[in-house]
C-alpha cells in the first residue's frame, strides 16, 4: 500500500509542465499563441489517425490474431465480480494467476484508504547527511521490453492493464532514446538533469549508457538455436505469431550462420541441427516455419534443456551463440518451477550462450518468461503482431542478437543534500553485491531514470559522479567509463533525451496508477487519473514531434475512452 501511495504522490502535472517550460526557454519561445503557456509547435493537438507502429483497431494483423476472443473485452465483464487478490503490487503476478484471465474481473475497491497526504508530507531530507551517498543501479537487459507491448496488446483488446504487469524500465527500453555512439568496446555515459519545480524541490535525473554501433558488415557469425513451443496451448494466434518470428529471423540470417531447431510439447524433436543457411530467407528455414503444428501438453523445461544441449554441442569459435525460446509460457508438464526451468539459461551463460525469450499468445504467462530471462540475463520481448515480429527480429536484429558489453552496473554518487525519491530502473542499493549487472546491446542504450529531491543546503557547485562498470565480451576485461559533473552543469546542459524519458515514465506510471486507483479509490478517481495522464502525454506528443509519442497518445486516448465507457452510470 505504501509503495502504491508513494507512486501516486510522486507523479504530478509539474513533470511535463517543467519539461515544456525548459524546452520553451531553450528555444526562446516562452508562451503559446493561445496564451496557455505551452510553446506553439505548429501541430494539430489531436492524435494522428494512424502510424507506422500503431494499431488499426478495425483489422489489426488479422492473420496473426485469428482467435482474439471477444469475451475478454469491457462489455462482457461482470461489474459485480471481484478479483482474488488484494492490492496489485509488483509481486501480484505470483499470487497463483497463471494467465491474464485471472484479471478479467473488475478490481475490488478497498474502502479503507490511508490519507495520501501522509505520504506526500514524508520528509525525504531527514536524516541530515554530511557525506555523499553512493548508489548502485541496474537496469534489466537493454532489450527486455515485453511490458509495453503487453500493455498495448491489452489496450487494443479493450482490457484493463494490471499494474503488476507494468515494468517501467522496460518501457524505457522499448521506446527509442538514443545518444552518440562510443567506439567499439566502450560505452557513452550521459547524465542529464531537469528541475521540475514545485515546493517539493524535485529534479529528474536520467543516465543513458549507450552501446556502440553495429552494422551488417561488422556483426559476428551467428549460431542460432530455436526452442519452439508446439503444445496445444499454442494453437491459433500464438502459433501464427511463432511462425512470424521464425520468418523474421530467416530474413535477417546470412551465409555463414547456422540454425538448430528444437520443437517440443510433451515430447521433443530436433528439427534442424547446425544447419548452414544459404542466405536471407533460406527455403529450409521458411519451410520449417510453415510446417509447425500444435498439440500435446507443455514441457517447457525439457524443451529448453535440449535446446541448450544443442547450442553447447554446436558452438563454433568466433561466433555469437543465441538460444531463442518462443512460447506462451504455460508450462504444465515436467518441471514447472520458474527457478528450475531458468537454471538452463543461468548455467549456459558460462558457456557464453545467451538467451532471448519471446512471448506469444492470449494466455501468456508473463511471470515465467520474465523469471527465466532475468536469471539467464537475456532479452525478453512479447510479440502481439507479425509487424512486431519484424520490428524485433529484422529492424532490431543486431540489438536483439549481439552483445556490446556485459555486466553493466552504474555507480551514482550524489551530494548529501540531493536525495533519491523514486527510481525507475530494476535494482538499486547502497551495496553493490545486491545489484545484479545486466548486458547492453549494440545500437541501444540502457536508461536509468529517477526523481530526486533537492534538500536545503544543496549548492550549484555540488559534485555528481556517474561511473558505468562493464565487461568486454571479447577479452572479458573489466572496464569503466566515468563522468564527473555538478548540479549546475547538469541543469544547464542538453536534455532532449530526458524530455522523452520523462514522458515515457509518466505514461508507464500512469497506467499503474489507473489500475491501483480502481482498487483503492474507485471508478471516478481512476478516470480522473487517466485523463490527467492523457493530457500530459498529449502535451509531450505536441512538443516532441516524435512518432513514438504519437503512438503512446493513441493508446492513452483509447484506454481512457474505454475506461469511461466501461464505468458509465
State each model region's role.
Residues 232, 247-255, 290-294, 308-316, ...:
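Sec-exported extracytoplasmic/periplasmic mature domains
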Residues 228-231, 242, 261, 307, ...:
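DG-centered beta-turn motif at the end of beta-strands
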Residues 23-38, 53-55, 68, 77, 287-319, 362-365, ...:
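Von Willebrand factor
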Residues 1-12:
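Bacterial N-terminal signal peptides that target proteins for export
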Residues 181-183, 316, 338-354, 360-473:
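Acidic, polar loop-rich interaction surfaces within structured domains
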Residues 222, 254-259, 298-299, 316-322, ...:
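Loop/turn elements at helix/coil->beta-strand transitions in domains of secreted/extracellular proteins
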